[in-house]
């Protein structure tokens, strides 16, 4: 079984080398184990057909290279003056406006999730309760006397 698969893969390898125009060595191999003989196939002598149509230049002109005209091109415009101005505008708005003003905006945002306010409020409430002799924490979050319940029917 294994020798048969090896013979098949050897034939495929020789055929692939022949179709690509690679020189294939004509080899005859005999296995001492199963008496299998591997020889090059008839496909090994065939060459790929030559192209019938001659190669032609591309009739469409290629894009002009902006770097031949303007070696300092930044890729924004064909005109060198507009190219430099567009580059300056992009970098001005990209760096100055977005980075500087954006970071200033983030720095002055209000308290995120009100963490600072809740801490200050808790400290104020603890001071008030200690000053008036009340317990620091109660089991009731709301004053039970102010809660109005519906009447039982």
UniProtKB/Swiss-Prot annotation:
It comes from the Eukaryota. One of its GO terms (biological process) is aerobic respiration. Keywords: Cardiomyopathy, Disease variant, Electron transport, Membrane, Mitochondrion, Mitochondrion inner membrane, Primary mitochondrial disease, Respiratory chain, Transit peptide, Transmembrane, Transmembrane helix, Transport. The chain crosses the membrane at residues 89-109. Residues 66-76 have a biased composition (Basic and acidic residues). It is a single-pass membrane protein. Accessory subunit of the mitochondrial membrane respiratory chain NADH dehydrogenase (Complex I), that is believed not to be involved in catalysis. Complex I functions in the transfer of electrons from NADH to the respiratory chain. The immediate electron acceptor for the enzyme is believed to be ubiquinone. This is NADH dehydrogenase [ubiquinone] 1 beta subcomplex subunit 11, mitochondrial.
């Amino acid at each position: 079984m294994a020798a048969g698969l090896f013979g098949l893969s050897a034939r495929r390898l020789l055929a692939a080398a022949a179709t690509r125009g690679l020189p294939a060595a004509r080899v005859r191999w005999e296995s001492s184990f199963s008496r299998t003989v591997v020889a090059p196939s008839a496909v090994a002598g065939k060459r790929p057909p030559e192209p019938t149509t001659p190669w032609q230049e591309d009739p469409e002109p290629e894009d002009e290279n902006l770097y031949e005209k303007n070696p300092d091109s930044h890729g924004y415009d064909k005109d060198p003056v507009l190219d430099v101005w567009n580059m300056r505008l992009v970098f001005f708005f990209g760096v100055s406006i977005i980075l500087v003003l954006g970071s200033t905006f983030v720095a002055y945002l209000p308290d995120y999730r009100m963490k600072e306010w809740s801490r200050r409020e808790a400290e104020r409430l603890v001071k008030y309760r200690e000053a008036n002799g009340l317990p620091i924490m109660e089991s009731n979050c709301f004053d039970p006397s102010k809660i109005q319940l519906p009447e039982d029917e």
